[in-house]
Amino acid sequence: MLSIMVFVPYINLDFETFNCYYIINSNYSEPLRTKKADASCSHVSSRGSVTRNEVIMEAYTSFARVYDMFMDNVPYEKWSRYIVEKLRANGIDSGYVVDLGCGTGKLTTLLADAGYDMIGIDNSFDMLDMALEREDDRILYLMQDMREFEPGEKVSAVVSACDSINYILEPEDLQAVFFCVSESLKEGGIFIFDINTPYKYEVLMADNTIAENRDEGSFIWENYYDADEKINEYDLTLFIKEQSEDEDDIYRKFEETHFQRCYEISALKELLEQSGLVFDAVYDAYTDDQVKCDSEKVTVIAHKA
């Protein structure tokens, strides 16, 4: 079945700006309404580290082409089982679920397999383009900024994996994300997300360099962590194999810079509560274990009262 990309522009009158959203895959069985964004979810400030934010807007452009190849060690199946378990424990066996920062749609697809009506939201056209190649008519993909997202209907749950939350660099922007989560959830709806920990940034990633070489491509990851600002920067250099009429392999070079912020649990809890959400628990990533001093990633669970 052919999937169609539809460009849906609208005017946000409150801020006199032109917001361009993409709705991808119009074959969704129950298309959601596309409506004007609520001003309460559109109060993103342009002050602060605007340069970094502009860089983030361009992130995952080249990397999207080889993301699944280099991220094949990510335990999406384990994550999806955990998320489904938590949703069902809270009486959510079906209904609309948002995958916020869905990337290429791997986790989104697994949650659709579990019976949920999935809405994948991401700000990267290239990542969504890769997700669209899965040709899964059960999933509605929306190109939206996490800080302003609006699924169109109240949903039963919002999930955000793969440290997507760490890409929100300013606390006021993260509060905007959480506020939009709160606005999107039904009463009693669940919010599940993961974040990288201070231990991962300070000890494991630090100022290290990682490299990997495969037939399809290679990458060099140069990491820098500023402990004072709590900002992690990593510069990616990619060499991606391209088809050639000659026998010799041709590799095209791409460069990207990514930024993430390290958040303390106490700060997250405060921002959640200020956004109308109730902090429930934090665990060592995708387990029911307590957070340890050497936990690399944690899972946070909250709900809308």
Residue map of PLM features:
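Short hydrophobic targeting helices and cationic amphipathic motifs
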Residues: 13-15, 28
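Conserved class I S-adenosyl-L-methionine
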Residues: 53-93
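Class I SAM-dependent methyltransferase SAM/SAH-binding core
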Residues: 98, 105-148
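A short acidic, Gly/Pro-enriched loop at the edge of an enzyme's catalytic core
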Residues: 150-157
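SAM-dependent methyltransferase
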Residues: 192-271
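C-terminal lobe and adjacent flexible extensions of AdoMet/dcAdoMet transferase-like proteins
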Residues: 259-305
